[in-house]
UniProtKB/Swiss-Prot annotation:
General function of this protein: Together with AIPP3/BDT1, cooperates to form a BAH-PHD bivalent histone reader complex able to read histone H3 lysine 27 trimethylation (H3K27me3) histone marks in order to regulate transcription, especially to prevent early flowering; promotes AIPP3/BDT1 binding to H3K27me3.
Organism of origin: Arabidopsis thaliana (Mouse-ear cress)
Taxonomy of the source species: Eukaryota, Viridiplantae, Streptophyta, Embryophyta, Tracheophyta
GO molecular function terms attached to this record: zinc ion binding
Quaternary structure and interacting proteins, as annotated: Interacts directly with AIPP3/BDT1.
Name this polypeptide is given: PHD finger-containing protein 4
Gene name, Swiss-Prot/TrEMBL: PHD4
Length: 161
């Protein structure tokens, strides 16, 4: 007679393939979606690339996706700037003595932020660097064409007068 697991203790058929009673087999039970609590549609569940703990369906996530991305980062890991930016604070001494920590951020363009504290208050400066282009041209400054004074630079003969 077979029990709930399907194991028939009285059956001799396949006795060579059955496990001895002293061995334990483990079945991997995957964690359910943290939003809806369901294990259904396992092919549509994303697992956080960083913590490997958070699991969400692509249709339960805050931003709905069409397919499971190769690398998905959960909201908790996204909120931790050290993990997301994968960089150390710019100045270790200043970071230890200050409640404000500066991180280097990388997006479609390279952005370097430097936060410094002074007695007069906090100053924030940002430098944006565009990636080099094949044919860089000088920056053109728009000129006011409404007045006739600035239409053309003076010629050599006019500047000598």
């Amino acid at each position: 007679m077979a029990d709930e697991s399907g194991y028939d203790a009285g059956s001799d058929a396949g006795s060579d393939a059955s496990l001895p009673s002293s061995e334990i087999s483990f079945v991997e039970v995957k964690k359910p979606c943290e939003v809806c609590g369901s294990n259904a549609n396992d092919h549509a569940i994303m697992t956080c690339f960083l913590c490997r703990d958070t699991r969400e369906h692509i249709y339960c996530a805050r931003v709905h996706l069409r397919s499971v991305p190769r690398m998905w980062i959960c909201e908790e890991c996204r909120m931790n700037p050290v993990v997301v930016n994968n960089v150390a604070p710019v100045d270790q001494e200043a970071a230890a003595s200050s409640s404000r920590i500066t991180y280097q951020v990388a997006d479609s363009e390279v952005v370097n932020q430097t936060m410094t504290s002074s007695d007069s208050g906090n100053q924030i400066s940002a430098t944006h660097q565009q990636p080099p282009q094949a044919h860089a041209s000088p920056v053109a400054v728009p000129m006011d064409t409404s007045s006739s004074d600035n239409q053309q630079p003076p010629s050599d003969s006019e500047s000598a007068i």
